[in-house]
Structure formats: C-alpha cells, structure tokens
Amino acid sequence: MEYKLEQHRHGLTVANDHNFKKDFEEFLDVITSITDQDIIDEFNKKTNTRSNSNRVLTKSISDAINKLIDERLTQKAWSRQSRIFGDRRFKDMRWTLDFAKQTNGIGTFCVEVVFNNAGSLGWNLLKPVLACEQNHVEKAIETKIGIIVLATKEMKVAGGFDNTVATFDDAPLYLSAMSNIISATPIVIIGLCAPKSFKIEHYEANYGNGRRKKAGRIVMI
C-alpha cells in the first residue's frame, strides 16, 4: 500500500532519530509490503467462509487490512493488544494499544489502526499520550512515539468504508483542537491510499433466513 505522512509535535523528526529509525522503517515496510492482491485475497477469504450455515459477508476492506497488518507486524515481534497500564482495573480492551514495539527492553512505538467512527478518533489519539507520558497509574508499557493509521478520503470511498469512518484528513483538525492535551507526545499520522487496481462496490446481499443487508464485492478497475 502507498501512504501519506503527517506529524504532530515533530513526530517524523523523532521517528527518524537513530534510536527509533529502524523500528519506524520496519513499520513502514509492513505497510508497503501489502499489495492490492493481498487485500483482495484476504477479503475473498472472509467472504467465502460460512457461519451457522450462512455466508459471512463484509462491507469494506478494513478487516482484510487489519489482519494483514497484524500478521506482518507480529512476525516482526511487535506486540498486539498491548496493555497500557499494569493495574488490573484497566485490563479491558479500551485500555490497550493495537500494537507496541520494544527494542532491547525499551518501548519505542505504540500504534492505533483507526477504521472506526470519527467520534472515537479523539480517544484513539489520546491512547499514545497515555502510553508515552508519565502517569500516576502503574504502566504495563511505556513508549516514546505514537503512530496513528487512518484511511485517506480516497481509500474510504474505494475501500467501501462506512460514511462515518474517520480519515487521515480529519486528524489535523482533532490534533489542533486537542493541542493543549496532546502537548508533548510526538505522533506520526499515516494515511493509507486507495488501491489502484480495484474498488469495493456495495450491493444488497442475502444473508440467509430472509435477511438482506449491504455488503461489498471486489470490482477490478
């Protein structure tokens, strides 16, 4: 996949520092290693499965991209669903990071892949702050730089994403409004570009038992 980059609090400058550059390039390599065909294959794999004798259909390529990123990052020793706090009161999913990286026992990057409702973007942007800055609650991991992955507007349309999904283009506005809160944490914002060889077309699908619902299918371009 191709991508765009933005930064908050000199995120790109810090990410390219010699202490962090290797891990940052490793993350970007994972993104660029994902091809259109990889996404098509993963999308079709899920579409062709069945649950309780009904087809499992999906509307967008978000699940396919999430799975491909997960598989390739974990192969490179990035931790998935990494807890921010060690305190057991904060053990549920809302207090975890999508991914985190430690090198030589030191946390470097924390990652949120954001394909959900724009109303949740503020919380997704705050998680790196919790992971990177000092807190009176015991930390399970402490990182230095946040990475936020979003779809660009073009990817949102071509990939069949819901109209309410936050985009790369929304992030600067949120970060500007939250600048007094996200005041010190360096953050890199990555916008995933639309596939070049296909798009998702929505249609009314039969889910079985008379149920019809919008689903997506691959259309080559």
Where do the model's predicted regions map?
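Structural motif
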Residues: 107-109, 145
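Interdomain/boundary linker segments immediately adjacent to catalytic/signaling cores
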Residues: 1-87, 221
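Catalytic cores of nucleic-acid endonucleases
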Residues: 115-179
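Domain-level recognition of nuclease-like catalytic cores that cleave nucleotide substrates
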Residues: 150-221
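Short, well-ordered coil/turn elements that cap or connect secondary structure elements
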Residues: 75, 105, 141, 182-184
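Active-site metal-binding core of divalent-cation-utilizing nuclease and nuclease-like domains
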Residues: 55-59, 67-105, 117-126, 133
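A broad, low-specificity signal marking well-ordered, structured residues that form hydrophobic/aromatic
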Residues: 97, 109, 187
